[in-house]
Amino acid sequence: VGFKAGVKEYKLNYYTPDYDTKDTDILAAFRVSPQPGVPPEEAGAAVAAESSTGTWTTVWTDGLTSLDRYKGRCYEIEPVAGEENQFIAYVAYPLDLFEEGSVTNMLTSIVGNVFGFKALRALRLEDLRIPPAYTKTFQGPPHGIQVERDKLNKYGRPLLGCTIKPKLGLSAKNYGRAVYECLRGGLDFTKDDENVNSQPFMRWRDRFLFCAEALFKAQAETGEIKGHYLNATAGTCEEMIKRAVFARELGVPIVMHDYLTGGFTANTSLAHYCRDNGLLLHIHRAMHAVIDRQKNHGMHFRVLAKALRMSGGDHIHAGTVVGKLEGEREITLGFVDLLRDDFVEKDRSRGIYFTQDWVSLPGVLPVASGGIHVWHMPALTEIFGDDSVLQFGGGTLGHPWGNAPGAVANRVALEACVKARNEGRDLAREGNEIIREASKWSPELAAACEVWKEIKFEFQAMDTL
């Protein structure tokens, strides 16, 4: 058969409903909204083609390779319940399409040009199944949950953090003072805000020095290991590594990176540096909502979370379920499990489209942060469990008596919740009662309870199934 020029329907080559997926395939679940008149099979096949080997017309050079070996295949299509003209298209990609150890390359293929494709009104990547054969080519998180606990010598409870506010405008010395007060009051960590890099009012080196001094002083006075997430995010990879090197020279335990604005290549480089040099790595997800908030277009956060676990990070922000930022409970717990656990079963009620086996890739601690305060502590302890970081920015620094009492209030509330849970009490039902009891012997907690007793952020969640 000679070369036949011309345009062929995608589904003739790329829609293969009888295909049996291989253990080594990367599987993707796309939410497809075809243009009027485009059948779902053609839309699904087009996604498979455009994100793998296909282009809009037959090309002569197709004959020089084995398309059957390399093409993506749309192997199943199902309508989305309750939505008109929306389908979930399942696509299988052969492993050989991807460079080993490169999240950048994986995403460039799977969520690259295809998202601008005219035959689709909208396209959203809901989930990815990463096969062990591919997972094994990644280092993953620099240390993981168990190693972090051993480094910090903290067990049996969530960790407590606080983002230093106002996020922009403080001088380095005043910033360091706030860090010291929070850590001295009983928090485990304080945090640079995601947009604190190296601005005219506070250059990075000055901030690093004052924060290091603050945390060593707090450490000496409390006998607990303390950390401050020093944001190493910078305009170039070289500058980022330079900042991480300086943090290591100061002897601090943890640095931080904005992985989406910084990019996966930079993030993976930093994760490798952190493992080689014993630094923990805190990841902030600034820009995620640009990608994941639209229900029918973009990428779900669970995909960004999986990508981060492969690229590397020891903590990542993951919504609160109860605060001011997005997060529906079951869906949030779904990707929290994908971050922490070795093996997660497929469970569509939690938005998990595929069984995910991480083999021996270390886990990532989910960070709950954004509009939370002492009254949320029982719910957060119950929802996230011990392996999490609970971060109270305004909920610490907004305390009427100042930063250190704000930290005391949060620590007392947390210890009370953990104690109550260990005694078998039901945090969901008795939460308010537990906090009230604890506030009787902690004036700091009592003052915090009074300030925030009426504050709620009640809006309809966008991230529904």
Curated annotation (Swiss-Prot):
Q: Which residues are catalytic?
A: 165 (proton acceptor), 284 (proton acceptor)
By sequence similarity, the record places it as follows: Belongs to the RuBisCO large chain family. Type I subfamily.
Q: Which residues carry this modification: N6,N6,N6-trimethyllysine?
A: 4
Q: Which reaction does this chain catalyze?
A: 2 (2R)-3-phosphoglycerate + 2 H(+) = D-ribulose 1,5-bisphosphate + CO2 + H2O; D-ribulose 1,5-bisphosphate + O2 = 2-phosphoglycolate + (2R)-3-phosphoglycerate + 2 H(+)
How is the cofactor bound here?
A: Binds 1 Mg(2+) ion per subunit.
| One Gene Ontology biological process | reductive pentose-phosphate cycle
Transition state stabilizer (site feature) positions:
324
Q: Where are the transmembrane segments?
A: none
| Gene3D superfamilies tied to this protein | Ribulose bisphosphate carboxylase, large subunit, C-terminal domain (3.20.20.110), RuBisCO large subunit, N-terminal domain (3.30.70.150)
PANTHER family tied to this protein: RIBULOSE BISPHOSPHATE CARBOXYLASE, RIBULOSE BISPHOSPHATE CARBOXYLASE LARGE CHAIN
Q: Which gene encodes it?
A: rbcL
**Stated name of the protein:** Ribulose bisphosphate carboxylase large chain
Q: How does it assemble?
A: Heterohexadecamer of 8 large chains and 8 small chains; disulfide-linked. The disulfide link is formed within the large subunit homodimers.
State the needed cofactors, names only.
Answer: Mg(2+)
Enzyme Commission numbers on file: 4.1.1.39
Q: So what does this one do?
A: RuBisCO catalyzes two reactions: the carboxylation of D-ribulose 1,5-bisphosphate, the primary event in carbon dioxide fixation, as well as the oxidative fragmentation of the pentose substrate in the photorespiration process. Both reactions occur simultaneously and in competition at the same active site.
Q: How is it modified after translation?
A: The disulfide bond which can form in the large chain dimeric partners within the hexadecamer appears to be associated with oxidative stress and protein turnover.
What are the GO MF terms of this UniProt record?
A: magnesium ion binding; monooxygenase activity; ribulose-bisphosphate carboxylase activity
Which superkingdom, per the lineage? Eukaryota
Give UniProt keywords alphabetically: Calvin cycle, Carbon dioxide fixation, Chloroplast, Disulfide bond, Lyase, Magnesium, Metal-binding, Methylation, Monooxygenase, Oxidoreductase, Photorespiration, Photosynthesis, Plastid
| Residues that, per the record, bind Mg(2+) | 191, 193-194
Location(s) in or outside the cell: Plastid, Chloroplast
Q: Tell me the residue numbers annotated for binding substrate.
A: 113, 163, 167, 285, 317, 369
The further comment given in this record reads: The basic functional RuBisCO is composed of a large chain homodimer in a 'head-to-tail' conformation. In form I RuBisCO this homodimer is arranged in a barrel-like tetramer with the small subunits forming a tetrameric 'cap' on each end of the 'barrel'.
Which residues are reported to carry the modification N6-carboxylysine?
Answer: 191
**Cellular component aspect of the GO annotation:** chloroplast
